[in-house]
Amino acid sequence: SDVYKRQPLAVLKNAFNYAKENNKSVHFLGLVSDGGVHSHSSHLKYLIKTASDFGLKKLFVHAFTDGRDVDPKSGSKQISDLINYIKDYPAKLSSLCGRYYAMDRDKRWERTKKAYDLIVSGIGNKSTDVVKSIEQSYENGITDEFIEPIIIHNNDNLKSSLINNEDVVIFFNFRTDRGRQLTEVLSQYDLEEPSMSKMKLKFLTMTSYND
């Protein structure tokens, strides 16, 4: 695809250079889907490849499953494809949840908080085989959009795979509306109820999420 031949934007270079110089993690957030409405998985792959080309070694993906713009049970294949792709790079799938939680746009903050707590505090169902966990959700009548937060558990330090202050965060959704709430509580302001606190992050988005 031509997407892999494009030169990274200056703002992306600056973020990757910052991460490299300060030994910080880079986190990729977004809808892992080939639906092309809010995001496209090819963009995530390009970002991972580019970060690796910069010599970055601490790359983490926080995946949101679709189920609305594509087949409601296509997430297992999408995630399996992503896992196979990142085997060639210093990247790991850290967490996963349905877009119902991560991409709410109607101020239902209790949903956003479940995604926030997952990627910041590691609160979710533990899994050592996330594709199997997704398929178990299907068996229980839960499709991609509604998959409960999952933290991918392995032998590595859990905290390092979560979003920490001073890290780089790249939200790769390119449509404005459904990335807004999670971006706001991660990087712009504190919310009292339910409690979510903004963090000190180098936060990048694919477009402006503000009105």
Name the predicted role of every residue range.
Residues 63-70, 97-103, 201-211:
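Short connector loops at secondary-structure junctions
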